[in-house]
Amino acid sequence: MTLRRYILAVLLLAPCAWLTLSAQEGNDEVGVWSELGIEKAITRNWDVGLDLEYRAQNKARFSVGLGTSYKVNKYLKFGLSYSFLYSEKNKYKVKDEVIAGSDDWTTGYNLIDEWYPRHRFNAEATGSVKLWNWLKVSLRERYQLTHRRAWSATKLMHREDHIKQVDFDEDWNEISWYETYVSDNTELKEYPTYTDQVLRSRLKLEYDKKRCPFSPYVSAEFHNSVSKGDHMLLQKIRTAAGCSYKFRKRNEVSLSYLITFDMYDIEEDELVRQTVRLHDRLHAINLGYKYSF
C-alpha cells in the first residue's frame, strides 16, 4: 500500500469505526435521513437547484428548499438558499416526585406532540484546495437565519399518584398498602415568535480523483448561535463520514453516517449539556440522490 492510500484509509475508516462503536453506547437516538435533489446549470459557473428532505427520527422533519450557487474560480464558491421546514415538536419529560413528609409519591410524564412550520435562509462561502491531486480540502462558512411565528401546542400531563393506605386487622396489627390514582390533564403551551441566527463552520476532507466515480469523505461542522447575549453560543457539533457515487454523468447517489452532539436548545432556551459527552447523541444514516443537467 502506498503512503497516499494509507493516509486516505486512516482518514476515512478511523472516523467510521469510531462512529459505529459509539452508537452502541449510552441512550443514543438513531434516525434515517433521505434527500432528493435536482440541479440545473445555467452557465458553466452558475447553477440553481431544488432539494427535498425528510428526517425520520424522534423529532421528525420535512423540508423543501431552493438554492443557487456561483463558482468564482476553482478555489471559491458562493451560495444562497431558502428552505421551508415542517418539524415535529415531540417533547417528552418524565415526572417523578416524592411528597415531602410522607411515604406518597407521584410518577408520570408531560408530552407535547405537534408539528409547526419554520422559514430558513442561508448565505455561504466555500473555499477549497486540492492537495496531491487527489485530496480536496474545503472550508464552508454559512450564515443561517431561521424564523418561526408564534404558535401553541397541547401538553398532555399524565400522573399516577401512589398513596399509602393504612388499616388494622382483627388483631389490631397495622396493614399498609399503596393505591394508585391515575389522572390525565391537558394544558395549552404558547411558543413566542423567535428568530435564530447561526454561523456554521464546516471542514471537509474528500477523495477527489479525476475519472474516479467514488468520492469518500469525512467532515466536522460547528453551529454557533449569535442570537443569545453578546457572544457566540455553541449549539451543536456534527460529524459525518460517507461516500458519493456518480454514474451516467448526470446522476449521483450518496450514503453517509452522521453523529450530532446537541449542546443548547435555542427554542426551549435551555442548556442541553455543558460539555461534549459520549451519551445521548443523535446518530443518522443519510441517503441521497441528485440529478444534474
Residue ranges and their predicted role:
Residues V30-L36, W46-V48, F62-L66, H119-A123, ...:
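Hydrophobic, lipid-facing positions within transmembrane beta-strands of outer-membrane proteins
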Residues L19-R44:
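Outer-membrane beta-barrel biogenesis signature
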Residues V218, D230, L234-F293:
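Predominantly the C-terminal beta-signal and adjacent terminal strand-loop region
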Residues M1-G26, F293:
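Bacterial Sec-dependent N-terminal signal peptides
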Residues R44-L50, Y75-L80, N133-V137, R211-S215, ...:
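Repeated loop/turn-to-beta-strand initiation elements of outer-membrane beta-barrel proteins
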Residues A60-R61, K77-S176, Y181-D184, Y194, ...:
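Outer-membrane beta-barrel translocator/channel fold
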Residues Q24-V32, L52-S63, V226-L234, R277-R281:
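Solvent-exposed loop/turn segments connecting transmembrane beta-strands
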Residues L36-K40, L66-Y70, L80, A123-G127, ...:
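Residues on the lipid-exposed face of transmembrane beta-strands in outer-membrane beta-barrel proteins
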